[in-house]
Amino acid sequence: MRMTILFRWLATLWFAGLIIFSAGQLAAQTEEKLLDDINQLPEAERQARLVDSAKKEGTVTWYVAMNRAYAQDLINAFEAQYPFLKVNALTGGGGALLNRVLAEHRAKSFQYDVFNTRSMTINTLKKAGAIMRYRSPYRNSLRDGFYDKEGYLNGIFATPLVFIFNTKLVNRKEAPASIEDLLNLKWVGKMAVDDESFDWLAALLDYYGEAKGTELATKLGQQKLNVRRGPTLLTQLVAAGEFFVEIDGHHQEAIAKKKAGAPIDYNFPQPFVPAKSLIPIYMSSRPPHPHAAALMADFLMSKKGQEIMSGHGRWVGHKGITAKGPDDIGDRKVVIPSPDKWGDRYQELIGLYNKLLLRQGGS
């Protein structure tokens, strides 16, 4: 008798859990389908539907892994375009916000609408069910590599990594211009690299293949690289003359410091320009304000939003926006690390980086 009661109790709990899980899955599918259906409408009708429904929602929550001042520029422009919406922004580091998103999803406490962080997180977020597909028509304006086929990945910017050099210490004609130039013995002990530039190595391995890429990284690691943390700090140290060359400088840092009068210049690496992993705008699988979330994601992919980011020195996803003069990447080959390949192998990538370039834990 007791076993029968226990069995019925367990069966009831299992069935209740199944109902809750199914309801959650259905809600996520319903919100994704809701926006999918709206995205099939003619442009003017689509926009009107989003705006009318967003007015009732009144707010949108954005988890922002971005410079606060840069984020505020975007928020100000968005709220000016949609004065009936208030952006609730939570800024923080990408890792901390990722953990928050995952914790909220596990607790079924759905707080955020949109979230930007590095694309290497996509597999983690997909497996957790924390993001949904958003197949906005604004995806059509994005460069190759800034979106996926499914609709989870909608890239807003990436960071090209360049060779920054001190112009008082290095003549432009002698500055390294290619990956293989870095292996010249004259640069031994004179180059600097960030201790977390894992995407630089991923791009190298993606371009050359893992065998040749590993060989080049091993040789580069033998050049006695000076290791620091933080792209801004590294560029400042190069400008101060502490190091001759920074091999993984952020493009926007180089532009900003050069314009400010620092004694630096830079080269786009050949035969390819490595890029820090793409920054997409993810859509919550359970957005509290789905229509406002769609407007926010659209704005960040739109020419207006992308021009603001370009003004911050970002290499943006919009095909119609380029930098001016020598700061334009032009038709150079840019390699953005594959999130599908490295997302599940990121710990392995970190280990390779520490071993090959930083010479830690092995030779």
Where in this protein do the model-derived segments appear?
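Bacterial N-terminal signal peptides
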Residues: 9-22
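Extracytoplasmic ligand-binding site segments that recognize negatively charged/polar headgroups
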Residues: 61-76, 87-105, 109-242
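Short amphipathic alpha-helical coupling segments at ligand-binding clamshell hinges
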Residues: 74, 212-219, 288-300, 308-311
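A ligand-binding cleft/hinge motif common to bilobed small-molecule-binding domains
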Residues: 121-124, 244-263
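Periplasmic-binding protein-like
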Residues: 144-145, 158-159, 187-196, 217-221, 226-228, 299-323, ...
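A bilobed periplasmic-binding-protein/Venus flytrap-type ligand-binding module shared by bacterial periplasmic
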Residues: 162-169, 205-207, 277-289, 308-309
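Extracellular/periplasmic bilobal clamshell ligand-binding domains
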Residues: 324-363
